[in-house]
Amino acid sequence: MNTVRVTFLLVFVLAVSLGQADKDENRMEMQEKTEQGESYLDFAENLLLQKLEELEAKLLEEDSEESRNSRQKRCIGEGVPCDENDPRCCSGLVCLKPTLHGIWYKSYYCYKK
């Protein structure tokens, strides 16, 4: 019974001492990995930042090229009443007095050219 206790005690002491050494090694290994991971994250962050800056530059370039006055304002679709003095018909449509079916409305409508 004594030999079993001594053997168990010896195995226990060896396990604890080797375990602590492994723990220190693991701690150092984890520290190295986190340092490598941080450098990788920094690299990835810089790469992403460069891509975002390029995208932003392209968007701003397109914005400056496009004039706000060149955009079509809200327009009236086909078959919708319009004002003969201020026609706002969409492109490809003209503000005309209706023929036949709409003459009793006494109004102008947007029709295709």
Swiss-Prot record:
Residues 22-74 form a propeptide. Disulfide bonds join C75-C90, C82-C95, C89-C110. It comes from Cyriopagopus hainanus. GO terms for cellular component: extracellular region. Keywords: Disulfide bond, Ion channel impairing toxin, Knottin, Secreted, Signal, Toxin. Expressed by the venom gland. Belongs to the neurotoxin 14 (magi-1) family. 01 (HNTX-16) subfamily. Probable ion channel inhibitor. Its main location: secreted. Residues 1-21 form the signal peptide. Transmembrane segments: none annotated. It comes from the Eukaryota. It is found in: Secreted. This is U11-theraphotoxin-Hhn1a.
